[in-house]
Design a protein with these regions (language model features):
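Terminal substrate-recognition subdomain of acyl/acetyltransferases
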Residues: 126-136
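Residue-level preference for beta-strand/loop junctions
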Residues: 21, 52, 85, 126-128
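Conserved catalytic-core motifs of GNAT/GCN5-like acyltransferases
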Residues: 90-93, 105-125
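Conserved GNAT acetyl-CoA-binding A-motif
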Residues: 74, 81-92
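Conserved beta-strand core positions
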Residues: 54-56, 89, 130
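Conserved active-site alpha-helix within GNAT-family acetyltransferase domains
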Residues: 67, 71, 83, 96-113
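Short amphipathic helical patch at the helix-1/turn junction of helix-turn-helix
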Residues: 60, 94-95
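Acetyl-CoA-dependent GNAT
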Residues: 3-63, 74, 80, 135-136
Length: 136
């Protein structure tokens, strides 16, 4: 939400492009007509040397934590990544987000690096990012 600058038309275009893509996806979880979470996979790049990799992103609104929404979104994205032919799925997560890290580890993601100032929040300043990956 802190960085969301799309208006309704831009968001519609973004979602249309994702829905027409053969190797990227954006999923929206809705509970009682409220957006509870979003998730997606995006190609790391189109060049041969990186086209086997995709990046996963998940966001669940705090009031919907603990309901399995993140788990469902993540597993749907993993399945889509496999179906799209990706070999490696990557993500980064703020080190303080222990709930998400536990979920990713339970799914089979492993840590492969850290960046002490990888994320900057307007509220809390710099935070450490953990880089994780999963072989598909």
């Amino acid at each position: 939400p802190d960085e969301n600058s799309f208006d309704a038309e831009q968001e519609s275009k973004f979602l249309k492009e994702k829905s027409e893509s053969e190797n990227e996806i954006e999923i929206i979880a809705v509970v009682d007509n409220v957006v509870a979470g979003t998730a997606g996979i995006e190609a790391v790049g189109t060049k041969y040397k990186v086209k086997h990799r995709a990046e996963l992103g998940i966001s669940v609104a705090k009031e919907f934590w603990g309901l399995g929404i993140g788990w469902a979104l993540m597993n749907a994205c993993i399945e889509c990544a496999r179906n799209a032919g990706y070999v490696q799925l990557e993500l980064n997560v703020v080190a303080e987000n222990t709930r998400a890290i536990a979920m990713y580890e339970r799914a089979g993601f492993v840590e492969y690096g850290r960046n002490p100032k990888g994320f900057q929040s307007r509220k809390t300043g710099f935070q450490e990012l953990i880089y994780m990956k999963m072989e598909l």
